[in-house]
């Protein structure tokens, strides 16, 4: 790899990071607008036209707030915790493909030594396995935040969140095993390519896996109706009760990054990813562009689903949450692996 290739990869990574941060910023605005609509009010509309500068105002607010440390906290761990959550969220995003390969012009091929531009930072053979491994490490950021804050509400929220994430990683992972069996690969690009003729959602094991995945996805991202770790009526705001200013912003952004990443993953696993439906424009030079448009449309639907569910459904009790994961989802996930194994034989 020469210096031009390294520089090109760094520029692409920086562009992806900028897109993700911008998407997260406006996702927060979208959530407040949707909440306002559901609650029959306007939502934020003072910063810029129709409130479009509200994310910028929020960012300035977080950056300029005074940094306050509670008494008797472990400062090193207290500061490391939000950094762990943010780092895991960014690294998980790195293996998500946004589209197919785009042919590069000849002059750029000479400069970079690359024939195509991959709309993905990295494409390891372990793909989906890498994504879930990195996502599971975010648990450490949460439990460290709860312990280092020297606050009972924070610690209880961290313990709840850790138990919840560990419990729902099992059905989440096992639902993906069914899709890996159907597609024969761990790479997200290969899984998307295997759905050219028929999306996985229209296959029996794929449909069952989708139902399991969506429920576990809400639990893994700590969103309603599974936000027991941040239950305002019980725990103030849970594990980040003692966090403010930019430190809180890191937790906040990481949560929205995880929601966007999960929306991308569910699209890639079950809804054909960036494949254009019915084989339209197959082999056409504009296929990657239209594929990106279709992919973003599907992702927007699932990001909206996160918001709609949050503001319309009540919260589970903690015992109901754990019972659903261990007694309902896991047995169904195991059964679905068997169904997928039988399905590919016929």
Swiss-Prot record:
The gene is nuoH. It is an enzyme of class 7 (translocase). The chain crosses the membrane at residues 6-26, 76-96, 128-148, 166-186, 198-218, 260-280, 289-309, 324-344. It comes from the Bacteria. HAMAP family: NDH1_NuoH (MF_01350). PROSITE patterns: COMPLEX1_ND1_2. NDH-1 is composed of 14 different subunits. Subunits NuoA, H, J, K, L, M, N constitute the membrane sector of the complex. Pfam families: NADHdh (PF00146). This is NADH-quinone oxidoreductase subunit H. It is a multi-pass membrane protein. PANTHER family: NADH DEHYDROGENASE SUBUNIT 1, NADH-UBIQUINONE OXIDOREDUCTASE CHAIN 1. GO terms for biological process: aerobic respiration. Belongs to the complex I subunit 1 family. One of its GO terms (molecular function) is oxidoreductase activity, acting on NAD(P)H, quinone or similar compound as acceptor. GO terms for cellular component: plasma membrane. Keywords: Cell inner membrane, Cell membrane, Membrane, NAD, Quinone, Translocase, Transmembrane, Transmembrane helix, Ubiquinone. It comes from Leptospira interrogans serogroup Icterohaemorrhagiae serovar copenhageni (strain Fiocruz L1-130). Its EC number is 7.1.1.-. Its main location: membrane. NCBIfam families: PRK06076.1-2. NDH-1 shuttles electrons from NADH, via FMN and iron-sulfur (Fe-S) centers, to quinones in the respiratory chain. The immediate electron acceptor for the enzyme in this species is believed to be ubiquinone. Couples the redox reaction to proton translocation (for every two electrons transferred, four hydrogen ions are translocated across the cytoplasmic membrane), and thus conserves the redox energy in a proton gradient. This subunit may bind ubiquinone. InterPro entries: NADH_UbQ_OxRdtase_su1/FPO, NADH_UbQ_OxRdtase_su1_CS.
């Amino acid at each position: 790899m020469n210096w031009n290739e390294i520089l090109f990869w760094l520029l692409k990574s920086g562009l992806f990071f900028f897109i993700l941060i911008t998407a997260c910023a406006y996702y927060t605005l979208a959530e407040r607008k949707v909440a306002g609509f559901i609650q029959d009010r306007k939502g934020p509309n003072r910063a810029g036209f129709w409130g479009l500068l509200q994310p910028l105002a929020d960012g300035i607010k977080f950056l300029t707030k005074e940094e306050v440390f509670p008494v008797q906290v472990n400062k090193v761990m207290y500061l490391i915790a939000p950094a762990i959550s943010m780092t895991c969220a960014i690294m998980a995003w790195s293996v998500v493909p946004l589209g197919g390969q785009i042919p590069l012009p000849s002059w750029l091929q000479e400069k970079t030594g690359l024939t195509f531009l991959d709309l993905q930072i990295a494409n390891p053979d372990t793909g989906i396995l890498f994504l879930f491994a990195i996502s599971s490490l975010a648990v450490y950021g949460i439990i460290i935040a709860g312990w280092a804050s020297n606050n009972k509400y924070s610690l209880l929220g961290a313990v709840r969140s850790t138990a919840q994430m560990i419990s729902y990683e099992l059905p989440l992972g096992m639902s993906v095993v069914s899709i890996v069996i159907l597609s024969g690969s761990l790479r997200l690009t290969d899984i998307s390519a295997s759905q050219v003729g028929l999306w996985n959602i229209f296959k029996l094991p794929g449909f069952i896996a989708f139902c399991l995945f969506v429920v576990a996805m809400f639990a893994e991202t700590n969103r309603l109706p599974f936000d027991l770790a941040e239950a305002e009526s019980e725990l103030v705001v849970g594990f980040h009760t003692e966090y403010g200013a930019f430190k809180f912003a890191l937790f906040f952004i990481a949560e929205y990054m995880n929601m966007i990443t999960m929306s991308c993953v569910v699209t890639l696993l079950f809804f054909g990813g960036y494949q254009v439906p019915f084989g339209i424009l197959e082999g056409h030079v504009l296929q990657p562009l239209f594929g990106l448009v279709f992919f973003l449309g599907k992702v927007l639907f699932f990001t909206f689903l996160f918001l709609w569910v949050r503001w319309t459904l009540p919260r589970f009790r903690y015992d109901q949450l754990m019972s659903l994961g261990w007694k309902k989802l896991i047995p169904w996930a195991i059964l679905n692996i068997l169904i997928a194994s039988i399905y590919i034989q016929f």
